[in-house]
């Protein structure tokens, strides 16, 4: 982890009578996404987005807006910012662990955002003890965490000499694969053998993320440099 990294939050990893102070870090680096702005072609002037009321075509300021849920065609119930705020989960600095399960029992399809957990002041020894225990037992911790007013399911697992935390999707958010309706197809032993040979030909010892780079991003960056120099992009 880079020395200049700053924790997102200070939390407590708790289960039973155990409470481990931890610092939460994002596992991904700040996005270096290339952003394009919308301009007027004739003079390069920036354009801005405005909101217009469908009923009368008049401009609507943000201060005049509320959120609404469409419960029937063209019919809405409105919620103020205060009403929505009141529905949020109570703020908590705890990651409440409810159970320990084999890591392989958690399907990767449920994985969302990933974070790193580091020991906070006074938490080094229990943090190390939990890490080593999870490594030895090949288990992961499943719990709940409230972030930005919403409760999330999380999995805490050992990673190298520390802990990583994955935010999970709720079951209702994941489309069952069986809904695709993929039927069974008969294949011969010869076809299966040939497919196995193709896999063996491309088989590697393990996944190396360094082997893959964002080539599209590289092309866009090169094109931007050419444009700045006044060159045409073909």
Model-found features: residue ranges?
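Boundary segments of small protein-protein interaction reader/adaptor domains
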Residues: 1-234
């Amino acid at each position: 982890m880079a020395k200049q990294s700053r924790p997102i939050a200070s939390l407590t990893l708790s289960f039973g009578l155990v409470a481990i102070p931890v610092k939460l870090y994002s596992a991904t680096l700040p996005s270096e996404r290339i952003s394009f702005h919308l301009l007027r072609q004739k003079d390069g002037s920036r354009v801005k987005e405005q909101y217009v009321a469908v009923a009368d075509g008049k401009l609507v300021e943000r201060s005049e807006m509320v959120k609404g849920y469409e419960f029937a065609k063209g019919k809405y119930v409105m919620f103020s910012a205060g009403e929505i705020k009141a529905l949020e989960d109570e703020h908590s600095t705890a990651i409440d662990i409810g159970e320990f399960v084999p890591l392989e029992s958690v399907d990767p399809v449920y994985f969302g955002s990933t974070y790193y957990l580091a020991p906070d002041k006074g938490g080094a020894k229990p943090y190390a003890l939990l890490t080593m225990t999870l490594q030895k037992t090949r288990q992961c911790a499943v719990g709940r965490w409230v972030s930005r007013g919403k409760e999330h399911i999380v999995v805490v697992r050992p990673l190298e000499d520390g802990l990583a935390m994955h935010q999970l999707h709720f079951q209702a958010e994941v489309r069952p694969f069986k809904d695709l309706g993929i039927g069974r197809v008969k294949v011969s032993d010869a076809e299966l053998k040939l497919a196995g040979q193709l896999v063996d030909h491309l088989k590697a010892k393990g996944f190396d993320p360094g082997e893959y780079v964002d080539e599209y991003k590289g092309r866009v960056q090169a094109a931007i440099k050419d444009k700045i120099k006044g060159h045409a992009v073909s």
